[in-house]
Amino acid sequence: MLKWDEEYLRLCKKILNEGKEVENRTINNTIKIPSYNFNLDVSKEFPILTVKKLFSRQAFLELLWIYQVGSNDVNWLQDRRVSIWDEWKIDLDGYWNAKQKVLNPDGSHEIKEIHKYFGKEYAGTIGEAYGYIVNKYKGVDRVLDIIKNHPKARDNVMSLWYNCHLDKGVLRPCVWSHEVDITNGTLNMYVHQRSCDVPLGLPFNVTQFAALMHLYARVGGYKVGTLSWSIKDAHIYVNQVEKIKELIERGKTLSIYEGYKNRTWLEGQLQNYKEEYDKILKTLTKEELINLKKGIVPDVLKSTDLKVKVCDYVLNPPSPELWVNPDVKDFYKFNNDDECKDIKVLNYKDLGKINFPVSE
């Protein structure tokens, strides 16, 4: 199991064991802990979850959308088959519509339809947030200038938090700032996250900023070092708890099999599980087979599917690394088309997809 997998599962367990259930602006309560911090050595391991599938292409395109393109236009993402921001897209009439908890005068909460007007000029966007802020204040330009010309500077900070724009964006930035440090030819990064959807947001965010470290390092000709992460309000939504428990059980199963040292025995188990898998496969309905191609494993196959993946994982462990096109040294020239062909994760293997619900 990768170091990032271990850290992630440790956080999930901590939230379930020590967290408090609280209300928030969404329909679903969260179980939260007030803060959490961790460090990852990006020089030794590219942090991408393997206990569940992470779609790196989408993650990298969202990263480029914000920090390279400086865009708030959801259509840009949709044109590249990225649907992350669909639910926060402002309609053509200038309104953003959602269901949220509203505080009544008597102190009670009520779920109501929200119709917030931003203006028709913001149609198709998320308002004045994320890439809009990057573009308006040229924050990345400053980061790159310091990396190239003033590497010893201690003020290389990129912030998305501007009070005058907070009410003009559909969402306030969750990961709201990052700092760059260069010491002895190594580029390190410190990331601040004010609110963290651990099941959905954090896996994407960590992989994105580890990639951003590599892109920044390429510009300045540096090595990558430590990614330090600070979370205020690390939470799991109550409707995500069962899936998180499933993920934790995956981790336990993987740890058990990693403890088996007899390779011949593991190879035999893998063969047995594959035969069992094929037998169950023949009993599936047409609809179940279609879903399986989409990564949705039917309940009758889940246990065997996991055992096949776990045995293969232990016998041929993943060692993910980030490939960045060596011919590109200008941050603004990394390809951001549909294929995101200048940034790829190599040697990646996962234990399968888990779908978590989103809370607006």
Predicted regions and their residues:
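Terminal, non-catalytic protein-protein interaction segments that mediate quaternary/complex assembly
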Residues: 1-360
